[in-house]
Amino acid sequence: MSKPINSVVSKVISVLGLLALMSPLNVTAQSDEITFHKDIEPILQRSCQNCHRVGGVGPMPLVTYDQVAPFAGLIEYKTGLRDRAGAMPPWYMEKDIGIQDYKNDPSLNDKEIVAISTWARSGTPKGDIADAPEPLVFDDSLKWTAGEPDLIVRTNSVTKLAGTADWWGEIDRVPVSIEQDRYVKSVEVVEVNDVNNTTGTGRDTVGGRYIFHHMIWSTAELDEDGNRVEESVTGWPVHEVGRNPDIFDPEGGRLLRSGTYIYSDSVHLHSNGQDTTGHLEIGFRFHPLGYEPKYERVSLGLGNGVDISIAGNQDNQELHAYTVLEQHTKFITFEPHLHAPGERMCLEAIWGYTVETLACVGYDHNWVRGYAFEDDAAPLLPKGTIMHIVGYMNNTETNPNVPDPRNWQGSGNRSVTNMFIDLGMRVKMTDEQFHEEMENRRQVLNLSPNDHVIGCPLCGAPLVAPMAGNEEASD
């Protein structure tokens, strides 16, 4: 017996209507799906592949889908650490406090971290190859991240045997081969050794690829006995494992004198697990001939390396250090330096009744990072400002960098003893330069009387009290 025609038509219409309703949802679901080629690969290219590729220093390449998918869970975990020790990429600036504008920032934003987690937990869908970005091409003959140097100075090679004790001491002086004094806009130190970057040494840490833990160095003329002529000394940022290049303020270049030598009486070598021969290459990039710096560097004793006391088996221990700015000062970088139990450092500026946090940074002793403020975000602080750093120490078994948390720790050079310093770069300014910098900041940021600039307590003063500013100008 045939069914009534109106019943059949009704069911067909119902099915077609249901399909019509479902189809847009299905298309939307497909377009919203997090896939490797569309969503994950661009993140890896920007923030990971410089190290995680064949020939890079990362422990595994993260270029193709087949290379990345097996490590999806680990990548989710490492990126989810955000600003704590062990996080990848190794950038530990906290994003919920202080200044947030930095140069060469490879960190992931919240949306990217969530995308990686979603992708890892949804079966690592590959997606359409048509969505993939163009593959990056790396030139392994270029080892300089700040740009090709104008001058490269090489130290003499040294050999560190597998399993031997750490060594501290001097290395040979090396001449700086330039015919005239030059101002330097950036300096970068890299270790070149015979470790096979493909096979590694069996050590998982960054230091496992290298034998130089650090070098404190300067350039100076030498007297007939080979000693430094003190008035000729120029200090340079310390080289440490995992350190990024040092780029000086564009108007505060540092002087490299002709006739000087690379001088270091504080080099730390360590075994990486296999016999290794290596040397350091120091790359200087110069300002053009005729350049004269507008600003001079200023050294601040902001830290404590003398009377540190860290109890065993205790977390959340704090260290504090203060100094007062004797000149108007522009902060170029913030570089927290702690040792094994260090987990975090914050930088504060105290001006009048205002206590302001400029930055808080997680700390990982495997990666010693400097954080360069963007030009229009660099702190501009008046003389008389009290600078304050706070170090947070974790001397418990939850800190994998601590070999035995039962031990009390004091001050010292070794990683199992402690330092607590801000090694950042700063320049000093005259009254006129300070006011000029603040006026430029007001113009660039288009500040109104209701705006506040972190790290520049007086930037808004002429906007809030213009009459007072005019009276001072007339005086």
Explain the meaning of each model-derived region.
Residues 28-174, 186, 259-265:
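Aromatic- and Gly/Pro-enriched helix-to-coil junctions and flexible linker segments
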Residues 324, 332-415:
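Extended, compositionally biased non-globular segments
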Residues 11-24:
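Bacterial N-terminal signal peptides
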Residues 184-185, 253-270, 379-395:
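Noncatalytic modules at the cell exterior or secretory-pathway interfaces
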Residues 200-222, 344-353:
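Short, surface-exposed beta-strand/strand-loop-strand elements in extracellular ectodomains
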Residues 123-127, 269-274, 392-401:
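Short acidic/polar inter-strand loop motif in beta-rich domains
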Residues 87, 216-266:
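Long, hydrophobic/aromatic-enriched structural stretches that serve as scaffold segments
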Residues 132-203, 273-341, 398-473:
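Solvent-exposed, flexible loop/coil segments flanking beta-strands in beta-rich domains
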